[in-house]
Amino acid sequence: TMGKGEGFTLHNTKMNYTDRCGVCKDIAGSLISFLRMAGLEAYPAMTMAGSRVESIPADHFNHCVAVVKLSNGTYMPLDPTWVPFCRELWSSAEQQQNYLPGVPEGSDLCITPVSAPENHYFRIKANNKLDKNGKLTGQFTLTAEGQSDLNIRRIFTTGWQSDWKNSMESQLLSISPKAKLLKVDWSKNPKDYQAAPIKITFWYEIPDYAIIGNDEMALVPLTMHGLYDQVRSYLRIDTDIPERQYGFKDGCSRLVELDETIQLPQGYRLVQSVEDNRKSPAADFEGYIRQENNKIDIHQKLALKKRVYEAGDWNGFRTAVNAHKAFGNHLIINK
């Protein structure tokens, strides 16, 4: 950088490359140059990453992005700093965020739109079998898109290839130190994030997974046992608080879909079925736990509709998330 006097001034592209500048404004400036070379109308914009900007003339900015003019005359924000290895052009970790475009006609403060939960789905489909000794064997497939994809794929795009399998194994070991990863399939080239949403399939066995009593067992559904909790940022929000006076934030809007079947040992039955359904402007939840023949079927669908919530959204958000968390309680099966 220039040192003293650097400020918010964008350098020209030649200086960015000859001086090897590399902060956000230099990355955004380079993108603007490339877009203009392609015949598009593009300009810089300022924002405050992760926070709001007050509607007063003051320095409330810490991040430089770009805007490009579309055929309908509107401007689309682009963030080349945040979207490498992400399947978006504007990071939805910055949704509902203020920005100020530096366009010739002038502009008031703008705000980025909400991204629909299904743009950031996180899905696990698991098929498991429990034996009479409490050992669980099975297979699950994980798929994700948007910000959920970015989080899960990070080990492949920025990590050492020699660590890939260890990272997969650590997900199972977080469930039980006895867990064994038998096989994992992360597709042909998981680093190619632009090809398709991430998909990983695990095969495993976990001895002593269930707690055994006299003609009964207790177990937590595998899909609620800590798998990829780093993606589920909503779990880090304290939903024991009954009321909030102020707004709150999550990492991103998100759709979580968890489906699991558990084949039971001969003669065992699920003690109690569960069904729940919650809807609100902030979040929705639907789910059930029930037995069909000798299998337990578990289904959950949690839709978190925003990144930035108002205090009035708390009851709907809290109710949906707590209903989802309750599906992580122990299931009791007996003869």
Locate predicted features.
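A sensor for short, sequence-defined functional sites
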Residues: 1-335
